A protein has these predicted regions:
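Mid-domain catalytic core of redox enzymes
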Residues: 182-312
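General small-molecule cofactor/ligand-binding pocket signal
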Residues: 33, 177-181, 336
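Helical element adjacent to the flavin cofactor pocket in flavoenzyme catalytic cores
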Residues: 138-194, 201-202
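Mobile amphipathic helical/loop "lid" adjacent to a hydrophobic cofactor/ligand pocket
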Residues: 4-7, 14-135, 139-140
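C-terminal catalytic lobe of FAD-dependent flavoproteins
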Residues: 298-343
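Conserved donor sugar-nucleotide recognition element shared by glycan-biosynthetic enzymes
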Residues: 134-135, 163, 340
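Short beta-strand to alpha-helix junction loop
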Residues: 10-18, 91-95, 104, 147-169, ...
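Glycine-rich FAD pyrophosphate-binding loop
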Residues: 1
């Protein structure tokens, strides 16, 4: 049947929000293709299922036609999209999403069945922590990614053949010098060099998580402790599989991103989410390949292809303030930092 490359980590990008990445893949002459960023919600309590892409898919569960609270949710989505950007004007940066929603009287169905699932899915964050995200951060992300409008959304794209294609190209000049599965235990800085486990180098780039960098540094500065220590990570269990029972029950509701939960706001555990990779990567194959976060117990063991463990940054008030301090620690003492935790 040939080989199919399926991404389980990095998947999509768009030209508006990823200009440097776009330049990189153009420089490497990497082929890309359009993707879909459709989103569905499936809840057990209440028994609810919808896909937000089209009017028909919103009402794929015919009971939604006769639920007054479902229409209230839809009205509040439109109201939130209209007023969100103006609502944060003049507000302190530590003003939370919860405070914004309370002040403007948004309904419980909108919060529990739309906004919280969306936020939990985007940032791989427990549902109970979504409302504590700073409103500025949340709304600016939505605005920058065209999520507060229906007519100015960026076109999302994927790497044709999977993200391994650009990785192979970028490492070509030095592939034989990469040391895989090589644990770094300690980095020490000196005025004219740095050492990595005793081996001497001119400079060092920490392309890893904030907490990992802090653990490896022998003598972190007060600024490094403050900045890197302010951005925690959370473990997410990831499974690549072909069990379509993790997708919405109604096939017409299947989306690229599929959120599922038993209790919308009672679950303090990690977000449960299934990516339909056939939709995301435009795979024209008989099997439906899924990537599920944090719901491995629901997956049929016979359908499991591979298991992974990923760590995602948690965006707290302290962490978002720390993101603005990149220049205080990067490029200093022969040390440079990059990673998803910078936002």
């Amino acid at each position: 049947h040939g080989t199919i490359n399926i991404d389980t980590g990095f998947i999509v990008y768009n030209e508006r929000n990823y200009p440097n990445f776009v330049k990189l893949i153009q420089e490497l002459d990497i082929q890309t293709q359009p993707s879909s960023m459709s989103f569905s919600v499936r809840l057990a309590n209440p028994d609810l299922e919808y896909n937000g892409s089209t009017l028909r898919q919103l009402f794929v569960d015919k009971r939604n036609l006769f639920r007054p609270w479902f229409y209230k949710m839809l009205r509040d989505i439109l109201r939130f999209n209209r007023m969100a950007a103006a609502a944060i004007d003049g507000r302190p940066t530590n003003w939370t999403l919860r405070e914004l929603l309370d002040e403007h009287g948004f309904s419980q169905p909108f919060i529990e069945y739309y906004l919280v699932p969306m936020g939990a899915a985007i940032w791989s964050t427990p549902v109970t922590q979504v409302l504590d995200i700073p409103a500025h951060f949340f709304i600016q992300f939505f605005e920058n990614h065209g999520m507060l409008t229906v007519d100015d959304r960026p076109e999302w794209r994927v790497i044709k053949g999977g993200s391994c294609q650009y990785v192979k190209e970028i490492i070509k000049p030095f592939a034989n010098r990469i040391r895989l599965n090589h644990t770094v235990r300690q980095v020490e800085r000196f005025p004219d060099h740095v050492t990595v486990d005793g081996e001497r180098f001119d400079e060092i780039v920490f392309a890893c998580h904030s907490d990992q960098a802090l653990e490896i540094l022998k003598d972190p500065s007060p600024a490094e402790r403050s900045v890197l220590g302010a951005i925690p990570y959370r473990v997410n269990e990831v499974v690549l599989h072909t069990d379509t029972s993790l997708l919405p029950r109604r096939r017409q509701a299947w989306a690229a991103w599929n959120y599922h939960s038993s209790d919308p706001l009672e679950n303090n555990g990690p977000v449960a989410l299934t990516y339909n990779m056939n939709i995301l990567q435009a795979l024209n194959v008989p099997d439906t390949f899924c990537v599920t976060l944090n719901d491995s117990s629901s997956i049929n063991d016979e359908d499991v292809l591979e298991r992974f463990e990923y760590h995602h940054p948690l965006f707290t008030l302290e962490g978002i303030a720390a993101q603005k301090r990149h220049a205080e620690i990067s490029g200093i003492a022969r040390t440079h930092y990059c990673g998803a935790y910078w936002g």
